[in-house]
UniProtKB/Swiss-Prot annotation:
Descriptive protein name: Probable methyltransferase PMT23
Native source species: Arabidopsis thaliana (Mouse-ear cress)
Keywords of the record: Glycoprotein, Golgi apparatus, Membrane, Methyltransferase, Signal-anchor, Transferase, Transmembrane, Transmembrane helix
EC number: 2.1.1.-
Cytoplasmic compartment segments: 1-4
Glycosylation sites: N70, N375, N442
Membrane topology label: Single-pass type II membrane protein
SUPFAM superfamilies cross-referenced by the UniProt entry: S-adenosyl-L-methionine-dependent methyltransferases
Length: 589
């Protein structure tokens, strides 16, 4: 029977349509088909922060419309450009917002070193430094790093007489010197031990805050004594010192005591250290020292090594007398004051463990804070009042390390002992059975870790025996558990993941997210969060996500557009690994 040409055409078209349909529903990009919705259908803006925001002048040419995705997130729809600007290699969005900084009415209180986040957050990618290499592995990195990874010659020149850092061939070498470490940091730490033998590193002193830390040699030295130090300094006070610290594998963050509280909970640190940290403690009615008092635990120590302690000229004597009056007004007592054979001196203060001294002061100046403090110190102004001490027997806390890792503070309202025990057991089993055995992570290359939704710090506690450290982040829209993290002898910060982190690019080997990123889509675009993750993670580093499959599929597509390699495990875990790919530089016209 003859078949007409029309029948043949219809048959061929039908066959082609069936083949196309089969391909669409079996291809990788269609494994998890979603309704075609724009990000604007599930995006609601983040509430305005108290800090004025301005659009940053380091950006790509792309418009917000080019970056919008539908929820199917097909890789081909995402186009990335390099950030523009001479400083884009080391760009930190919330600290490099020059347009906002130019509009500040005052810089007297270091306002220009505080956070001023751009709106919208940039979605461009940062270029790599020329000749960037995988970092020197730990522990060798504590003593030397690749110069090409952090090519900042000014600090080397500026601090060459103080033995902070030297350039030797392809490397930057850290001899362990410093402004106050004339005989080296090891000698300086021993000097502290002799000055106050009751300081037992790695036992009653586990969590330390180093103010104005330089290249963090003090904190790096204490790692050998089972002490973890949160080292901080403002950006560019000396060129890239915090970047050097993190490249070395030493815990550090960018921060400043300016007009706002530090992003740490109250009563957190066992010891605070300042060696010529250039903070005027008596400024603005003593607010900077009152902030240290807030984050120092009852019975904790403050070590101050600066010229007013051991020199007698008019200027230093005036500063010392002001410090005497201020510390007396907040009931800190001097437990020792001494000078080393190097000519460097220090004084060690101790915070009281009871409020009896507060009530006996002849004048209530500074006054006690009249309201219960919220631990969440995110964009909270500095207060000119004296923080009340926690209730209960604070003299018995904390437990000696490492027992405190699994202990709960008496009268704790943040967590009960049984809750912490179950959380610890859950994370211990998950890390040993899944993270270390089955996920595509080479843990021998991992040193700097950030847990994006840390909870009680269970993930960090489960990794405690590995040669790495964890920055535990408690999101500001989650339950406030950061005080528990510090009680356990771990470190961390508050943060809003709809904004950029106070850290340099390429500073973490692994970011971990447990059921965080899916919730964030209610407040900000997941694309901007992934762009921030790409900024933070080093080439060769990892993103490990535990979440629902919908979130994992979205992330897999976005990471694919960034040329990250990805693997999914048991439909619950996604491991992404960053490569060296960057978008092509725009052609000069």
């Amino acid at each position: 029977m003859a078949i007409s040409v029309q029948h043949v055409v219809v048959l061929l078209l039908s066959t082609l349509l069936i083949a196309i349909t089969f391909f669409l529903f079996t291809s990788d990009n269609a494994r998890f088909p979603f309704p075609s919705l724009s990000t604007t259908d599930y995006y609601t803006p983040i509430p305005k922060s108290p800090i004025p925001h301005r659009i940053v002048d380091v950006s790509s040419d792309q418009t917000p419309q080019k970056m919008k995705l539908n929820t199917s997130l097909e890789v081909g729809e995402l186009k990335w450009d390099l950030c523009k600007g001479a400083e884009s290699v080391d760009y930190i969005p919330c600290l490099d917002n020059y347009a906002a900084i130019k509009q500040l009415k005052s810089r007297r209180h270091m306002e220009h070193r505080e956070r001023h986040c751009p709106e919208p957050s940039p979605k461009c990618l940062l270029p790599l430094p020329d000749n960037y290499k995988p970092p020197v592995p730990w522990p060798k990195s504590r003593d030397m790093i690749w110069y090409d990874n952090v090519p900042h010659p000014k600090l080397v020149e500026y601090k060459k007489e103080q033995n902070w850092v030297k350039k030797e061939g392809e490397f930057l070498v850290f001899p362990g010197g410093g402004t106050q470490f004339k005989f080296g940091v090891t000698h300086y730490v021993e000097f502290i031990e002799k000055a106050l033998p009751s300081i037992k590193w790695g036992k009653n002193i586990r969590v330390v805050l180093d103010v104005g830390c330089g290249v963090a040699s003090f904190g790096g030295s204490l790692l050998d004594k089972d002490v973890i130090t949160m080292s901080f300094a403002p950006k560019d006070e000396h060129e890239a010192q915090i970047q050097f610290a993190l490249e070395r594998g030493i815990p550090a963050t960018l921060s400043v005591i300016g007009t706002q509280q530090l992003t740490f909970p109250s009563n957190a640190f066992d010891l605070i250290h300042c060696a010529r940290c250039r903070v005027h403690w008596d400024a603005d009615g003593g607010k900077p020292l009152l902030e240290l008092n807030r984050v120092l635990r009852p019975g904790g120590f403050f070590i101050w090594s600066a010229t007013p302690v051991y020199r007698d000229n008019d200027r230093d004597s005036r500063i010392w007398n002001e410090m005497v009056s201020l510390t007396k007004s907040i009931c800190w007592k001097v437990v020792t004051k001494t000078v080393d054979s190097s000519g460097i001196g220090l004084v060690i203060y101790q915070k009281p463990t009871s409020e009896s001294c507060y009530n006996k002061r002849s004048t209530q100046d500074p006054p006690l804070c009249d309201k219960k403090e919220a631990n969440g110190s995110w964009y909270v102004p500095l207060a000119k009042c004296l923080s009340k001490l926690p209730s209960g027997n604070v003299q018995s806390w904390p437990e000696l390390w490492p027992k405190r890792l699994v202990s709960v503070k008496p009268q704790s309202i943040s967590v009960k002992a049984e809750t912490l025990k179950k959380d610890t057991e859950k994370w211990s089993a998950s890390v040993s059975d899944v993270y270390l055995k089955h996920l595509a992570v080479n843990w021998s290359t991992v040193r700097n870790v950030m847990d994006m939704n840390a909870g009680f710090g269970g993930f960090a506690a489960a990794l405690i025996n590995l040669p790495l450290w964890v920055m535990n982040v408690v999101p500001v829209d989650k339950p406030d558990t950061l005080s528990v993290v510090y009680d356990r002898g771990l470190i961390g910060v508050y943060h809003d993941w709809c904004e950029s982190v106070n850290t340099y690019p390429r500073t973490y080997d692994l970011l971990h997210s447990s059921f965080l990123l899916g919730d964030l889509t209610q407040r900000c675009e997941i694309v901007q969060v992934v762009a921030e993750i790409d900024r933070i993670v080093r080439p060769g580093g990892y993103l490990v996500v535990q979440d629902n499959m919908e979130t994992i599929m979205k992330l897999e597509s976005i990471l694919g557009s960034l040329h990250w390699s990805t693997k999914i495990y048991e439909d619950r875990f996604l491991v992404g690994r960053k490569g060296f790919w960057r978008p092509a530089k725009p052609e000069l016209r």
